[in-house]
Amino acid sequence: MADSSIYSTLELPEAPQVQDESRWKLKAVLHRPHLSRFAMVALGLLTVILMSLLMYQRILCCGSKDSTCSHCPSCPILWTRNGSHCYYFSMEKKDWNSSLKFCADKGSHLLTFPDNQGVKLFGEYLGQDFYWIGLRNIDGWRWEGGPALSLRILTNSLIQRCGAIHRNGLQASSCEVALQWICKKVLY
């Protein structure tokens, strides 16, 4: 047998341009997750910044004593706002239980100082009048729905089982006596 070799020349069309285009498309597909991740992180940061600014604005606006911001909760008519609380100072007089019911009907409670702080400071703003507060003596002096009283309260008689406040501090009184009262409501 004779040794015969056949040679052929293979001519391929120039395809580097096609390969370059496919490489770019492949790179674009591979880089898309990085871009979407970057976009999500950027949007997340923007959201956090905007929420922080809104909270800061609310604190500045709503935290002021005499806030007039339209989006801040306001006190009902005839109530006085101080910080995040509304206070109602009655003009009429009722016994302690009727005063307690009045406040409850208004979604509030008789004024209390559960941490026993602020009694003296609050009393300085009151005149000569006595006001019922959420304090009574049932097995010891206790704030309504709260802890025991750790302050001194003036009392003259065993029938004085309800607490009142005036400019000189706390005073015990008979619960049937008609006094003005102070309700306290939390705004937010």
From Swiss-Prot:
Glycosylation site list: 82, 97
Keywords from the named record: Cell membrane, Disulfide bond, Glycoprotein, Immunity, Innate immunity, Lectin, Membrane, Phosphoprotein, Receptor, Signal-anchor, Transmembrane, Transmembrane helix
GO molecular function: carbohydrate binding
Annotated ranges, domain C-type lectin: 82-184
Membrane topology, Cytoplasmic segments: 1-33
Biological process terms in GO annotation: cell surface receptor signaling pathway; innate immune response
Compartment(s) of residence: Cell membrane
Record topological domains on the Extracellular side: 57-188
A Pfam match: Lectin_C
Annotated consequence of substituting residue 7 to F: Abolishes the formation of KLRG1/PTPN11 and KLRG1/INPP5D
Tissue-specificity statement: Expressed specifically on natural killer (NK) cells and activated CD8 T-cells. Not detected in spleen, thymus, lymph node, testis, brain or kidney. Not detected on mast cell lines, bone marrow-derived mast cells, or peritoneal mast cells.
PTM characteristics: Phosphorylated in response to monoclonal antibody G63 binding and antigenic stimulation.
Protein's membrane topology: Single-pass type II membrane protein
Database matches in PANTHER family: KILLER CELL LECTIN-LIKE RECEPTOR SUBFAMILY G MEMBER 1
Function: Plays an inhibitory role on natural killer (NK) cells and T-cell functions upon binding to their non-MHC ligands. May mediate missing self recognition by binding to a highly conserved site on classical cadherins, enabling it to monitor expression of E-cadherin/CDH1, N-cadherin/CDH2 and R-cadherin/CDH4 on target cells.
Record text about domains: Contains 1 copy of a cytoplasmic motif that is referred to as the immunoreceptor tyrosine-based inhibitor motif (ITIM). This motif is involved in modulation of cellular responses. Upon phosphorylation of ITIM motif KLRG1 associates with the two phosphatases, PTPN11 and INPP5D.
Subunit structure as annotated in this protein's UniProt entry: Forms a monomer and homodimer; disulfide-linked. Interacts (via ITIM motif) with PTPN11 and INPP5D.
Protein's name in the database: Killer cell lectin-like receptor subfamily G member 1
